[in-house]
């Protein structure tokens, strides 16, 4: 009986100690931002979605303002490099693809930060050297306008886009480098090379940004596009005639990650923002805009987005080492006038 009592006392003490430690971590995170008053967030996350995150964050921490700069991953990377070279430091928090973040890490543009909430994430979702943590997954899929494409004609796999009937009638992002490089990694140079050469001959339309692609697909500007499924699900809820294929093999998947800028002028506020996005509350906001949260306790809002049901191929962790090569190849193939 005494042993049992001693064990209960020990367990209770450990539990209370863990709770006290967590509270101390949170208290220390809050103290600094109250002095800094703002955080600057450079992100690729679409305007509506980042606004939802900021609204939740500022409701919880009303003493802080968040300024958001949204652009493509490549443009954000170049902007941070340009600012750093000029000795100007504006960004506190960066959230881009793991490929872009790998490039920025290699250039010394990040500082290591291990958020308390990152403990809830699997090892594969966290940088080994603690420079960044994953916040959501982005799947590259084929989307189509159901009012323009008969059910029997709907493309299901990537090679379906080589059918002559789709010539000039499908669209993709003008910076689709991750998708391009991952298919090369998965299929091998020979198979992928033949596919992309044939795909370029199909004269796809190029647009800037997947949000725009999804909106134009819904508007009927083209019948088929390579899109992110969470944006298709958002449009479906608003009544748009769009759908996406769940059976493509592979479904290339990019991880969007969040990090603290190397010379963050409001580093304490930046840390608090990162910790919030990784928290269950922050990940629930990500879930509610139909994105795919990566905190294990928060499941996707749409069952079809359950990653275990899809033939996922993740963008290789070291792709940033080859990105210049892939960018050039992609542009040479698809940017021809």
Predicted features and spans:
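Bacterial N-terminal signal peptides
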Residues: 6-17
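Short amphipathic alpha-helical coupling segments at ligand-binding clamshell hinges
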Residues: 53, 191, 195-198, 256, ...
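A ligand-binding cleft/hinge motif common to bilobed small-molecule-binding domains
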Residues: 99-103, 223-241
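A bilobed periplasmic-binding-protein/Venus flytrap-type ligand-binding module shared by bacterial periplasmic
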Residues: 141-148, 184-186, 254-266, 285-286
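Extracellular/periplasmic bilobal clamshell ligand-binding domains
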Residues: 302-337
């Amino acid at each position: 009986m005494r042993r049992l009592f001693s064990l209960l006392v020990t367990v209770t003490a450990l539990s209370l100690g863990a709770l006290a430690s967590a509270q101390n971590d949170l208290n220390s995170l809050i103290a600094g931002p109250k002095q800094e008053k703002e955080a600057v967030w450079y992100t690729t996350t679409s305007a509506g979605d980042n606004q939802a995150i900021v609204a939740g964050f500022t409701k919880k921490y009303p003493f802080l303002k968040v300024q958001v700069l949204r652009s493509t991953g490549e443009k954000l990377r170049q902007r941070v490099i340009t600012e750093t070279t000029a000795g100007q430091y504006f960004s506190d928090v960066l959230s881009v693809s793991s490929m872009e973040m790998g490039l920025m890490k290699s250039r010394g543009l990040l500082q290591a930060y291990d958020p308390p909430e990152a403990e809830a994430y699997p090892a594969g979702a966290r940088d080994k050297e603690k420079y960044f943590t994953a916040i959501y997954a982005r799947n590259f899929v084929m989307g189509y306008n159901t009012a323009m494409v008969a059910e029997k004609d709907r493309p299901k796999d990537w090679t379906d886009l080589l059918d002559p009937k789709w010539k000039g009638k499908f669209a993709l992002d003008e910076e689709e480098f991750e998708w391009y490089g991952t298919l090369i990694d998965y299929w091998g140079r020979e198979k992928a090379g033949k596919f992309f050469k044939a795909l370029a001959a199909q004269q796809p339309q190029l647009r800037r940004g997947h949000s725009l692609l999804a909106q134009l697909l819904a508007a009927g500007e083209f019948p088929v596009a390579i899109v992110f499924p969470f944006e298709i699900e958002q449009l479906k809820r608003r009544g748009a005639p769009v759908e996406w294929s769940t059976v493509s093999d592979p479904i290339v998947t990019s991880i969007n990650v969040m990090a603290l800028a190397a010379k963050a002028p409001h580093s304490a506020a930046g840390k608090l923002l990162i910790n919030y996005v990784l928290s269950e509350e922050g990940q629930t906001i990500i879930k509610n805009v139909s994105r795919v949260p990566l905190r294990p306790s928060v499941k996707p809002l749409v069952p079809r987005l359950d990653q275990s049901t899809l033939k996922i191929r993740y963008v290789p962790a070291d792709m940033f080492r080859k990105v210049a090569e892939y960018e050039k190849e992609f542009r040479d193939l698809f940017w021809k006038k």
